[in-house]
């Protein structure tokens, strides 16, 4: 076993000893929040981990990388990468009883940048994640009507036909791009604020504030609904989906394995990235949540339970999604065939009912033989069920276009629409609880807010400030900004944070010390699996994924898809290059958080080198006192 531990002077003065830990827990029982029960804690963690990405990212990756074959690297990396880091975050938060900023500052003052980066990433993700929730609320509000507003095109101003943009695309496309986003044709064309979206964004932040106003005291009550209702809705959709025509075709298509994909490095890279992001690791929220546990809570068992639920949910959601996609593909296949049948009937004046899907090819042959010239004038569509099933859609396109189109073809469509968007709302809201925790707690640890200010005020100021910045997402170009942040702002920083977390605990805090801490908390030392993954396997996997991600993102040109009615292949999305100034934006939103970690470490090094020996001794004494009083200031 690797036993390298880097020098870390003063560590014992910055953290509580195991003997003092239980005493401090009793003393802070009245001042520090704690969970009402174990179920409340687990539901909160599950709600934070299981988010919108499980709904619209995992099914797409399965479909793109060999169906059932993708499950193999996903499950392997879930065990070797996801569970070990989850256990580490649970254990270190429970042991040091602080948020992310306090935890890493306690381990080493130079690691404060890790906590700061987690806070910045949580802030950026919350910034655009709640915008998605506002879109979900807009669709939810519009679901309480019959027919659904995206089921048919609106009439033009003269009432003589449909709006041209809708007629050339589809009702679901038109409602999403024009009625909802009123999207521009470029990220440079900002346009104006869409007031309906602004009101929905205000509602989203207001709901989040009410749910997080007192931290876990309020979120702990809400998660009983937000973390369980999605599973109820998913089960209802699965039962309904399996009764729809073509549902099994979608499920079979999803899980039909293409084992050749296992030899594709991109498949393993995407599986590793999906495991990492689906656990919401490195945001700091899980560390804060675990810090509210009892000292002797079994964090090892918690990490396994949450991991199993998360992995099961990803697969379960994929089955539900593709049962509906199978139904949608079958409907489109039937519509395509009906159009071809109608073309053949009209071209040869055949009696209705004489041509069916079963005899269509034979009737084509007969018509071609009887009048080749007339047959040559007919234009038939290509109807292939696999092509409809293979239309890989992820992200907002899956939720707001593909699924909404499928819902319009279901009986009692408003009911299914309401259920679907309530489910998405709960998934998004419960994930935002963790993001808010990852911002509020570090700000409290930084002491930038006067201690006399109540937590309700701090939470309100954060929600208000983020809401004001979120105005950019209500512009005509808002969707492009959101996609930009989602694609480039958080991936690299999160991977860097996760690697630093694992390295810091194992080689700065010391894995042997960590093992003793866990033995004290749960009654036994971590077994050989945890030792191997923490010391070697998990850091190596994260480093490989980080390097690959960095190489891919740096080497590729920044492009994005736009909705352009003037595009010659409309309604297909047009892919264009980002303007040059976007590169500067990407460097700022991705580079600043990433560079915070080494920058703060260098700052501490320079500061320590410039201090006089007497000042250093005084600093150690101060840190020791602050550590015992629970008031670390670095």
Curated annotation (Swiss-Prot):
Any Pfam family matching the protein: SNF
Q: Which residues are modified by glycosylation?
A: 158, 182, 258, 354, 368
Q: How does it sit in the membrane?
A: Multi-pass membrane protein
| All ranges on the Extracellular side of the membrane | 63-65, 142-192, 243-268, 326-413, 478-487, 553-581
Residue numbers of Phosphoserine PTMs: 17, 627
Catalyzes what? L-alanine(in) + Na(+)(in) = L-alanine(out) + Na(+)(out); L-cysteine(in) + Na(+)(in) = L-cysteine(out) + Na(+)(out); L-glutamine(in) + Na(+)(in) = L-glutamine(out) + Na(+)(out); glycine(in) + Na(+)(in) = glycine(out) + Na(+)(out)
Enumerate the Cytoplasmic topological stretches.
1-41, 87-120, 214-221, 290-304, 435-456, 509-531, 603-634
Residues of the signal sequence? none
- Give the record's keywords alphabetically: Amino-acid transport, Glycoprotein, Membrane, Phosphoprotein, Symport, Transmembrane, Transmembrane helix, Transport
GO MF:
neutral L-amino acid transmembrane transporter activity; symporter activity
Q: Single Gene Ontology BP term?
A: sodium ion transmembrane transport
Q: Where are the transmembrane segments?
A: 42-62, 66-86, 121-141, 193-213, 222-242, 269-289, 305-325, 414-434, 457-477, 488-508, 532-552, 582-602
GO CC annotations on file: apical plasma membrane; brush border membrane
Q: Which InterPro entries match?
A: Na/ntran_symport, Neutral_aa_SLC6, SNS_sf
Instruction: List locations, semicolon-separated.
Output: Membrane
* Record NCBIfam families: Na_transp
Query: PANTHER family from the entry?
Result: SODIUM-DEPENDENT NEUTRAL AMINO ACID TRANSPORTER B(0)AT1, SODIUM/CHLORIDE DEPENDENT TRANSPORTER
Q: Which family does it belong to?
A: Belongs to the sodium:neurotransmitter symporter (SNF) (TC 2.A.22) family. SLC6A19 subfamily.
Quaternary form? Interacts in a tissue-specific manner with ACE2 in small intestine and with CLTRN in the kidney. Interacts with CLTRN; this interaction is required for trafficking of SLC6A19 to the plasma membrane and for its catalytic activation in kidneys. Interacts with ACE2; this interaction is required for trafficking of SLC6A19 to the plasma membrane and for its catalytic activation in intestine. Interacts with ANPEP; the interaction positively regulates its amino acid transporter activity.
Q: What does this protein do?
A: Transporter that mediates resorption of neutral amino acids across the apical membrane of renal and intestinal epithelial cells. This uptake is sodium-dependent and chloride-independent. Requires CLTRN in kidney or ACE2 in intestine for cell surface expression and amino acid transporter activity.
What is the name listed in the Swiss-Prot or TrEMBL entry for this protein?
Sodium-dependent neutral amino acid transporter B(0)AT1
Q: What is the lineage of its organism?
A: Eukaryota, Metazoa, Chordata, Craniata, Vertebrata
